[in-house]
């Protein structure tokens, strides 16, 4: 259900809470659906397992579960279906300091039960396993996980497949981050093209002299677009950098092709970066490989905004300055 549908149905819609663990306020969590849940260990302590393997090895990176991680995988997650038969855990991914679960609610829950109570019960079981394994017999005792949790509502099978692949790839991405920490660090207040910006990625791309600004104007003919596309991709082929805000569909198309080919890209963003930001999908690999730099002249915000014409002009002007056009 969208926000507009919720309002039309007479439901109370609250303002977005500035928290990485916010719920969708107009969704009924007692109804059937598919969710990806994320629970983070308090203080991000690596209590659930150890990252092993290598990027070059035949097995690849993987997480070897600790005794606590094993207890969660072998005992606690199975209790969810035992206590709530209408729920199934379709996927469990345990990382050293957090875990993800894809949970399917096959039937509506009744008598005041909802997903939040399911998670609370699961966390309670994990707490008991944690206290037992660490000999924490006397109160006060802290829980294993941070307060709250994050959920993502999976609306279709395509999302399910995407997030299953994402969870399977988690150990590899973590190892890449650990091997390339500077490429995933958020820098604030860095001066770029005369502005204080937030940046993530390979900052040395700014020093490459061969740069082009990928900007497509409406007045361009098909022939002009084809010629410019060829010139921009040729710059990438020779080791140069494509600079763009990727606003229009044709700009996005060029940047997507450049990323598929492994070319250097500087991407300008309307939004900044949250505290625990990391790129996803192909952008993650590009960042780890040193071929991507993301820049935003604005602070991060949680609201879903439509980029304004003024912001488009601002970012395009920045792209031209970075490319040395102005």
Task: Report the location of each language-model feature.
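Glycine-biased, small-residue-rich flexible motifs in mid-sequence functional cores and linkers
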Residues: 186-326
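Short catalytic/metal-binding and nucleic-acid-binding patches
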Residues: 1-186, 192-195
């Amino acid at each position: 259900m969208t926000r507009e549908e919720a309002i039309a149905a007479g439901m109370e819609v609250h303002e977005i809470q500035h928290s990485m663990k916010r719920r969708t306020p107009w969704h009924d969590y007692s109804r059937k659906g598919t969710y990806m849940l994320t629970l983070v260990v308090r203080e991000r302590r690596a209590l659930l397992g150890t990252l092993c393997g290598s990027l070059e090895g035949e097995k690849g990176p993987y997480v070897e579960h600790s005794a606590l991680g094993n207890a969660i995988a072998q005992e606690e997650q199975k209790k969810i279906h035992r206590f709530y038969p209408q729920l199934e855990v379709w996927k469990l991914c345990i990382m050293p300091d957090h875990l993800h679960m894809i949970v399917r609610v096959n039937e509506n829950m009744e008598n005041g039960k909802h997903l939040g109570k399911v998670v609370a019960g699961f966390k309670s079981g994990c707490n008991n396993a944690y206290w037992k394994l660490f000999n924490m017999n006397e109160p006060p005792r802290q829980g294993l996980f941070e307060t709250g949790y994050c959920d993502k509502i999976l609306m279709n099978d395509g999302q399910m497949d995407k997030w299953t692949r994402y969870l399977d790839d988690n150990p590899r991405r973590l190892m890449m981050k650990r091997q390339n920490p500077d490429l995933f660090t958020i820098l604030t207040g860095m001066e770029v093209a005369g502005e204080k910006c937030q940046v993530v990625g390979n900052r040395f791309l700014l020093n490459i002299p061969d740069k082009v600004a990928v900007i497509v104007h409406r007045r361009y003919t098909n022939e002009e677009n084809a010629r410019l596309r060829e010139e921009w991709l040729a710059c990438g082929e020779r080791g140069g950098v494509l600079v763009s805000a990727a606003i229009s569909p044709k700009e996005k198309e060029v940047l997507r092709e450049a990323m598929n080919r492994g070319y250097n890209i500087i991407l300008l963003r309307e939004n900044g970066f949250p505290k625990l930001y990391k790129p996803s999908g192909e952008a993650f690999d590009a960042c780890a490989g040193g071929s991507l730099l993301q820049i935003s002249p604005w602070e991060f915000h949680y609201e879903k905004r439509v980029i304004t014409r003024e912001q488009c002009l601002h970012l395009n002007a920045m792209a031209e300055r970075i490319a040395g056009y102005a």
